Amino acid sequence: MKKYDAIIIGFGKGGKTLAADLANHGWNVAVGERSTGMYGGTCINIGCIPTKALVHYAQVTGYRRPSTFEQYAEEFKQAILAKEKLTSLLREKNFKNLDDRETVTVYTGEASFRSPYEIVVKTDTDSFLLEGEKIFINTGATTIIPTI
């Protein structure tokens, strides 16, 4: 069992900011994230930044005024590739920002509570038992619209 001052479940905006701040104050921190494709959270990966990038590329395409469907298809393909490159770069920077810190350990896997102070992180190949004095849940949320 590995012991930490804090365990943060979720590598989104709140989790990464909290982990960096706690590490700056000398805390030994574990961060668990289910998906390598979500380091940095929704805004970086599937929300604000990629959608705004695609809007920008659509505007640029409009200025170029492609004359055929094939040209539009190529513009779209290039926009998707550019968006993927951007989000990949941001994910990598966010990951390195925490993983390069001496007092932060990033675990990529599904985290669940074993007890009030223990978390199990299951990866594709292993399982880690972590103990934390403080545990923060930063997993995001999904909107549910109730039937009326």
Task: Locate the predicted segments by residue.
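Glycine-rich flavin
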Residues: 2-4, 21-27, 33-148
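The conserved SAM/SAH-binding core of class I Rossmann-like methyltransferase domains
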Residues: 9, 32-33
